[in-house]
Amino acid sequence: MKFTVEREHLLKPLQQVSGPLGGRPTLPILGNLLLQVADGTLSLTGTDLEMEMVARVALVQPHEPGATTVPARKFFDICRGLPEGAEIAVQLEGERMLVRSGRSRFSLSTLPAADFPNLDDWQSEVEFTLPQATMKRLIEATQFSMAHQDVRYYLNGMLFETEGEELRTVATDGHRLAVCSMPIGQSLPSHSVIVPRKGVIELMRMLDGGDNPLRVQIGSNNIRAHVGDFIFTSKLVDGRFPDYRRVLPKNPDKHLEAGCDLLKQAFARAAILSNEKFRGVRLYVSENQLKITANNPEQEEAEEILDVTYSGAEMEIGFNVSYVLDVLNALKCENVRMMLTDSVSSVQIEDAASQSAAYVVMPMRL
């Protein structure tokens, strides 16, 4: 195996394929990258057995086919440490891989390519293409609601659901729920899968904001995304995701509208004097007015009064202020609508001008 490539052509692919690798691999070979040269292309693969990332780099200079695996971190650090515009010549000699550039020379240990674990072959059941920006929006709108190391393992991820011409993402940790739907202009079978938290983060990392469309394939146990020269595959979480439709408030009759930034700033200020552990704030809603109060064990108090659009019965309700702020930060809109029922029912929050995303936050007893 032998190839020569410019440093700039190798850095981004190396960075992307090193993404899935954990800090301390369970098997030594999982800390390595698989390098394969064939048909004028260098393929780089990194895996942690749950997901894999493959990058392809076109080789324009003379090369010889072959394959090996090398320590990912060291190879990346060497390439990154070389000067801009450097040419990197790589050659396999016995059990060592030689890396040369200018007057620098490195000899890396290798492990046989045949020992590198590949994800099993699988058949895709649903396939579609969408703009990167659409996928980015779907993930950004909901990922903050994913659970983190919950014993209900199926909550440590994101539900991807196809229905009609829409792709939907849903995330919940049992206290709050986020759902976002976007039309993708293709008629799709009804199908839903749970992508693990780490897979969602890697999928987000591979979106570079370019014009290259994203091609998605979903199988019974795997999801794969292709964009440009990168292919990302992740195993799915096996479990039943809660039905988000049953979580949305049935018929909330009290609607409050207010400026998103105004609300965000008021909640952020009130949060300063909320209980550090429970983060509770109390909302008092009356005719065109919202009062937010918070206090803590030191008996310090915060009060914010805002002009809002509201006509309905007066009520009070408590929330974890962190959950409300997460929603307001994700909304990025001008005005928000809060749909309330009573003091013991969840609130639904959405962009007043769009219904593509909805957020549900459970109340707190204060």
Curated annotation (Swiss-Prot):
GO molecular function: 3'-5' exonuclease activity; DNA binding; DNA-directed DNA polymerase activity; identical protein binding; protein homodimerization activity
Binding site for DNA: R24, R73, Q149, Y153, Y154
Segments for region (3): 245-365
Cellular component GO terms, alphabetical: cytosol; DNA polymerase III complex; Hda-beta clamp complex; replication inhibiting complex; replisome
GO biological process terms held by the UniProt record: bacterial-type DNA replication; DNA damage response; DNA strand elongation involved in DNA replication; DNA-templated DNA replication; error-prone translesion synthesis; negative regulation of DNA-templated DNA replication initiation; regulation of DNA-templated DNA replication initiation
Biotechnology: Small molecules can bind to the hydrophobic cleft and inhibit binding of various protein factors, suggesting this may make and attractive antibiotic target.
Record-linked SUPFAM superfamilies: DNA clamp (SSF55979)
Stretches the record annotates as 2: 129-243
Note: The temperature- and UV-sensitive allele dnaN159 does not grow at temperatures higher than 37 degrees Celsius. The global SOS response is chronically induced. The UV-sensitivity of dnaN159 is dependent upon Pol IV (dinB), it has an enhanced Pol V-dependent mutation rate (umuC, umuD), and is absolutely dependent on the polymerase activity of Pol I (polA) for viability.
Pfam family, one: DNA_pol3_beta_2
Family statement: Belongs to the beta sliding clamp family.
Annotated stretches, region: 1: 1-120
Function: Confers DNA tethering and processivity to DNA polymerases and other proteins. Acts as a clamp, forming a ring around DNA (a reaction catalyzed by the clamp-loading complex) which diffuses in an ATP-independent manner freely and bidirectionally along dsDNA. DNA bound in the ring is bent 22 degrees, in solution primed DNA is bound more tightly than dsDNA, suggesting the clamp binds both ss- and dsDNA. In a complex of DNA with this protein, alpha, epsilon and tau subunits however the DNA is only slightly bent.
Induction comment: Part of the dnaA-dnaN-recF-gyrB operon, but also transcribed from at least 3 promoters within the upstream dnaA gene, induced at 42 degrees Celsius. Induced 1.5-fold by hydroxyurea. A shorter isoform, beta* is induced by UV treatment and also at low levels in late logarithmic/early stationary phase growth (at protein level). Beta* transcription induced by naldixic acid.
UniProt keyword DNA-binding present: yes
InterPro entries per UniProt: DNA_clamp_sf, DNA_polIII_beta, DNA_polIII_beta_C, DNA_polIII_beta_cen, DNA_polIII_beta_N
Result of altering R24A: Mild defect in DNA replication, impaired loading of clamp on DNA, polymerase speed is wild-type. More severe replication defect and very poor clamp loading
Effect of M146L: No effect on synthesis of beta*
UniProt keyword annotations, A-Z: Cytoplasm, DNA replication, DNA-binding, DNA-directed DNA polymerase, Nucleotidyltransferase, Transferase
Summary of subunit composition and partner proteins: Forms a ring-shaped head-to-tail homodimer around DNA, which can be opened by the delta subunit. Binds interacting factors in a hydrophobic surface cleft between domains 2 and 3, each monomer is able to bind different proteins simultaneously. The beta* isoform probably forms homotrimers which probably load onto DNA. The DNA polymerase III holoenzyme complex contains at least 10 different subunits organized into 3 functionally essential subassemblies: the Pol III core, the beta sliding clamp processivity factor and the clamp-loading complex.
Subcellular location: Cytoplasm
Protein name per Swiss-Prot or TrEMBL: Beta sliding clamp
Main location, first listed in the record: cytoplasm
Gene source species: Escherichia coli (strain K12)
